């Protein structure tokens, strides 16, 4: 029998916590990235922060779209970092390690999000 807290399982609560973390990272990217872009820096952070915030919100709503938005932003991050520094592992590591680690956690939440979507659909609260 799974651990339950209220009507949610532990994995659902952890998924929601991950959604909050992604929202906070996305907000930081948008706010600090806008400042950086105004100073003439890369607009990557603003462009990447928007789907992070949206993805985190969708994860809080229990929708798989949130996970796929994050994974899309992760793919954009990989392309950007390759364009920025090439194939140098020393330069790629700080750009890709954290987002990829979060991406692995997000990918692991997809079955949980699907279960949450199915339960919501069965209740009729789309």
Curated annotation (Swiss-Prot):
Catalyzes the oxidation of glycerol to glycerone. Also acts, more slowly, on a number of other polyols including D-sorbitol, D-arabinitol, D-mannitol, meso-erythritol, adonitol and propylene glycol. The chain crosses the membrane at residues 13-33, 41-61, 67-87, 92-112. It comes from Gluconobacter oxydans (strain 621H). It is an enzyme of class 1 (oxidoreductase). It is a multi-pass membrane protein. Keywords: Cell membrane, Membrane, Oxidoreductase, Transmembrane, Transmembrane helix. It catalyses: glycerol + A = dihydroxyacetone + AH2. Its EC number is 1.1.99.22. This is Glycerol dehydrogenase small subunit. GO terms for cellular component: plasma membrane. It is found in: Cell membrane. Its main location: membrane. GO terms for molecular function: glycerol dehydrogenase (acceptor) activity. It comes from the Bacteria. Disulfide bonds: none annotated. The lineage of its organism: Bacteria, Pseudomonadati, Pseudomonadota, Alphaproteobacteria, Acetobacterales. The keyword Cell cycle does not apply.
């Amino acid at each position: 029998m799974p651990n339950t807290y209220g009507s949610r399982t532990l994995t659902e609560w952890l998924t929601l916590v991950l959604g909050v973390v992604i929202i906070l990272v996305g907000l930081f990217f948008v706010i600090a990235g806008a400042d950086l872009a105004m100073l003439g820096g890369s607009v990557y952070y603003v462009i990447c922060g928007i789907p992070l915030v949206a993805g985190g919100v969708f994860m809080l709503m229990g929708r798989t779209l949130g996970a796929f938005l994050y994974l899309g932003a992760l793919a954009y991050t990989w392309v950007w970092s390759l364009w920025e520094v090439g194939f140098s592992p020393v330069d790629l590591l700080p750009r890709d390690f954290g987002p990829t680690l979060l991406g692995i956690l997000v990918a692991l939440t997809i079955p949980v999000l699907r279960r949450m979507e199915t339960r919501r659909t069965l209740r009729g609260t789309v």
